[in-house]
Amino acid sequence: LIRKHNLFAKIDLIIGLPGENLSDIENTLEYMMETVRFGQGHLLCFHVMRGLPGTELLEIAREFNMTFSSKNEPHEFMKSPDLPRKDMLKCLRRTAVVFRLTNHRGWSRREFISENKSNDVNIRDSFFKTREKLNLTNIELVDQLVEGLLDHLKERNSWFVQPDFPFAETWWWNHSAFEVRDKWIIEYLGNLKPQQLSA
């Protein structure tokens, strides 16, 4: 429908639902990037699963042996047998990059967060041009951006590069556009060559 009718859409996704694993989240991110590829405006929201006390969802989460912590953000999902912490961290970094790419100027003609309008879709165009040139999936290219950002943001000691990526959701909502400039994204994508790709 988004593509067919050129709709403005707000889409909410929760990362770490009971029973969800790395492959499930990867497939969802891949699908959503294709879904918002052609829209004129959208907000692709990502939230980390919260184990709120007294909720039915928390009871279901317990059946899946899910672990939550309020160390950084309230009742935040940390890990489960289906999604070990290492896999969750991979999901968080991928999600942060997808959020940064798709929710700010340069992807669609209307920035849903600020309501700004622009004809600038250079990030979207660069992303898909690079994806096609390198014959990658959306998430394979996102993984290349994650690797680049781990190096690029190291000097500023961004939350993104810290081993446990604390405050991940806060980072993608409030810090990603300031720490990851459009110019860096476009240059990084433009400089990727097939022989440089990390496994």
Where are these regions (language model features)?
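Radical SAM enzyme core and accessory elements
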Residues: 78, 85-199
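A structural motif corresponding to the C-terminal lobe/cap of the Radical SAM core domain
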Residues: 1-121
